[in-house]
Amino acid sequence: MPLFDVYPLYNVTPVSGKGIHVYDDKGVEYLDLYGGHAVISIGHAHPNYVQAIKNQLDHLGFYSNAIQNPLQKQLADKIEALSGCKDYELFLCNSGAEANENALKLASFKTGKKRVIAFNNGFHGRTSAAVAATDNKNIIAPINAQQAVAILPLNDIEGVKTELEKGDVCAVIVEFIQGVGGLDQGSAEFFEAIDKLCKANNTMFIADEVQSGYGRSGKFFAFQHYNVTPDIIPIAKGMGNGFPIGGILIHPDIESKYGMLGTTFGGNHLACAAGLAVLNTIESEHLMDNVNVMSDYFIGMAKTIPQIKNIKGRGLMLGLEFDFEVGQLRKDLIYNHHMFTGGAANKKLLRILPPLNIEKTHIDQFFEALKKALSANN
């Protein structure tokens, strides 16, 4: 049976990984500066992570949410301890799209309203309301377009105010660092205005931390760089280091009721074991401190490359913007220099999302290869 052909693929077949490297079926080593869309947070095959999953598999891999699973509470407590998000409650699911879907559903339950505000170049997933709130018409089917969404420019405080005053908006959803859209960030004034306007208009403020969370910004959550208190915080990608897991942190003002949210696989024993291993490693290896040190070093190196016209993002969620489309450059880096990087909706942007335990030597290797690739492409 052929696979449904929806992914344009590079001709590389990774079969193993260790740390910041992956190895293909021919034994070639690649430096992974992309982590499969910011999923690999603590490095490929980290021994703590591998051992935790193996140990759990020896006991119980899965049972449904019809029984007690103490691992879920352990994971919730660890997220609270590392993030500093006190008094929030955790609902576990399986992916970022599912996290955002449940966040929007919960906002509608809480407010009794159904319209959503999202922003230009935002990406929130490929399902139902989440994809309707995504600024990409190519992936929105007619069935998704039934969801009422106002998509506004980033930093448009007056636009947000005008839409909220109509009285029918259940949620404002925003990425504090845009991922697929191209690493743009709103201003502090903008984010803080959203927070105040939502509170004044019975609207839920959703901070989409699916890609920017789990230490990638240099703080546990990207919204923590600002003076805001989101109502709902969707999380996923770096949460399981490759094991499918997602969730939403829910402000205590939102009351839970039996059956309002649910999932078969969400919060299963293996997923929780993976999630705990990631958090324990972020803590024990001081990876958020490393993010800040490596980010400063990376940005300093990037500033020495004249072809780089703009450096976007923060922490280890970075974008290098050129004055030409980077598709060929990415191919050169993969096939000739054996390095994985990412693209974005902005075709002139190279996206950098490495594991959080990257070292200076890896960054040096990247910039040496980038200089050679840029020279070859001139």
Specify the residue positions occupied by each region the protein language model found.
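Conserved N-terminal phosphate-binding loop of PLP-dependent enzymes in the Aspartate aminotransferase
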Residues: 1-378
